[in-house]
Amino acid sequence: MSALGQSNSLLHFPALQPPRRFLFGPGPTMVHPRVYEALSKPIVGHLDPYFIQVMGDVQQLLKMAFGTGSGTGSGTNDSATLVISGTGSAGMEAAVTNFVEPEAKLAVFANGYFSDRLTEMAKRNGANVVRFEKLWGETFTEDEAREFIRREKPKVVAYIHAETSTGALQSGQAICAAAHDAGALAIADCVTSLGGVPVDFDQTGIDVAYSCTQKGLSCSPGLSPMAISPRAMDWLRARTSPVRSWYFDLKLIYDYSTVSHRYHHTAPISMFYALREALLVIAEEGIENRWERHRRCHKLFVKGIEAMGLRMHVPEEHRIATLNTVCVPKGVDEAKVRRRLLDEAGIEIAGGFGPLAGKVFRIGVMGPLATEDNVQFFLKEFSKALHAEGYSI
């Protein structure tokens, strides 16, 4: 085929027409129409004064979401907020690469897939990793956290605040306090919690937190918000060995976004527009009102699930309000249930993986879908799909 003929054949790709889905999975979630509109705004340069202002707006609004400063985005606290150009895994990599030096001891609270991923990143960075392991879905008590850190004397401690693979919410106050008593930094993975449940960065004593945009913030995927405490910033400035990643060097990124605005990389302009709008939507609702809405819908969801005779995987006191893990009933093929929901109702949910593969459904109720009507809609369709696959309700 000639080059001209090949070129003409490429013109036959159809126009994009994504199917309408109800994103009840662990993420990405539904996006507010204003966020879609923001994505369509004209591009400016990544060094343009207007974009510099947009970055500043995003950093200020993130203070509200993380719970640092006054909690209203006024910027009264010295904690830094910034945004990594990449998904939540980029934020994880940035946290590990910048704050866990080669051969330094990192203590990881391991109870799910994403603590395993963090462990792998740290090992590739040359860290000496020690792990406190529990079954997927379990959490760590205050006494367990203190004893582990006291015994290991690490330089850095890491835990998953909201474990996406299990739906378990880990309290961080005892972990962070014990880390500080040991002279260590505390890193928290807030990928599934930010925007949907309180992170309380300052109150908890977190030093470094990272998240993503496509879950609790109800934005499209592509950015990783971070918050960094003053003591972590001091530690970073005093670091003697070079950060092994140039792209994820937070000193360079912070200088570009906050200080001199010298070129570091070409930021994804449209995604910053989208994140700014998503954060404004949250601010207009009120962050505490948003948390309460998610709590209310979570309770309604659990009530409906239990009325079907189904069981939640995580104990009540440790559940994430935005992400539910429901045990698959005996004799039911969870993959067939998920496929039926997608084909017949346009509903997307996720299955488990790792030790939970085939054993749980992972169902997100977050952002625009966290309303009583939407929860009732989901429960009705979920019940129908289960019944069609042989489950008697």
Mark where each language-model region is.
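Active-site C-terminal subdomain of aminotransferase-like
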Residues: 30-31, 214-303, 307
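Conserved active-site segment immediately N-terminal to the catalytic lysine
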Residues: 202-214
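Conserved PLP-anchoring active-site segment centered on the Schiff-base-forming lysine
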Residues: 100-116
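Active-site phosphate-binding strand-loop segment of PLP-dependent enzymes
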Residues: 139-195, 208, 216
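Conserved PLP-binding catalytic core of the aspartate aminotransferase-like
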Residues: 311-344
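PLP-dependent enzyme catalytic core of the Aspartate aminotransferase-like
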Residues: 2, 16, 355, 359-393
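Conserved N-terminal alpha-helix of the aminotransferase class I/II PLP-enzyme fold
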Residues: 38-94, 113, 117-123
